[in-house]
């Protein structure tokens, strides 16, 4: 069964329409680390709340392509190109 109940709000549309501006902004410093650094050879672990933020969406650049990770109302994660 496919869950198409995506989080859609004005903030989401702002992010999509201004994605280039968002990606080209200079990074800002934050006193809180996004995640604990990996210990030894363990992979990095990041909570979905930290990754998606208040808008419930994150843009991921992978090999020059932009992907969108978002959370559905049912709490599932959807990754689209």
Curated annotation (Swiss-Prot):
User: What Gene Ontology terms for biological process does this UniProt record contain?
Assistant: iron ion transport
Keyword Ion transport listed? The answer is yes
Q: Which InterPro entries match?
A: Hemin_uptake_protein_HemP
Q: Which domain of life is it from?
A: Bacteria
Q: Give the UniProt keywords, A-Z.
A: Ion transport, Iron, Iron transport, Transport
Region Disordered: list its residue ranges: 26-46
Q: What are the boundaries of the signal sequence?
A: none
Query: Per the similarity annotation, which family is this?
Result: To E.coli YdiE.
Indicate what this protein is called per its UniProt record.
Answer: Hemin uptake protein HemP
């Amino acid at each position: 069964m496919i869950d198409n109940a995506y989080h859609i709000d004005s903030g989401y549309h702002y992010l999509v329409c201004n994605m280039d501006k968002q990606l080209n902004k200079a990074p800002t410093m934050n006193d809180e680390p996004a995640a604990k650094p990996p210990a030894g050879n363990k992979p990095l672990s990041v909570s979905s709340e930290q990754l998606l933020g208040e808008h419930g969406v994150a843009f991921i650049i992978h090999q020059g392509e932009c992907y969108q990770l978002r959370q559905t109302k049912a709490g599932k994660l959807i990754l689209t190109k």
